[in-house]
Amino acid sequence: MRVFGKINIIGLDNGYGNIKTANGIFPASVTCCEAEPAHAQDVLVYDGKYYVIGAGHREFTLDKVGNQDHYLLTLAGIGQELWCNQLTTAAVHLAVGLPLTWVGDQREQFRAYLSQNRHVDFNWRGINYHVDLVGVDVYAQGYSAVIPELRKFTGANMLCDIGNGTMIVMAINDRKPV
């Protein structure tokens, strides 16, 4: 997480196998429970429902917005980052990734999906969080990993992002993705 003024920028990789942030990684699975789970550690409470996060494995689908799973996983990722930075109330701008081949078709849909609530209250691992979601940017997965070193990418280069169900290859010519 990076702080610019009063805005907390959280980078989050919404993978199919795992959700990754700067300070954590957990399996990308969601199980809804009727009552508070007795022994689960990674519990998200949102909209009056209990969700166990990371206790299983999701099936691969081509659409991340078909249900609430990736929204809930994103809330857990936000909670993880805020906890690591000792915050419970924050203005958050998300920087998230989609596979390169999906960015063109799904960028706006995924941005709208993650932006469905400007003000979000939830509980992650027993701590209440209050988030003002001020923005969402969607990037090609893997590209963010090379941005700090982009000045070194002269000539023709290839970036390979291997995920759980995806493998994306991106050409980078003279510091620009093609």
Predicted features along the sequence, with ranges:
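Nucleotide/phosphate-binding catalytic cleft detector across ATP-hydrolyzing
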Residues: 1-159, 175-178
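Active-site-proximal alpha-helical scaffolds that flank and shape metal-associated catalytic sites
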Residues: 160-165
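Short, acidic (Asp/Glu-rich) active-site segment that either coordinates a divalent metal cofactor
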Residues: 168-173
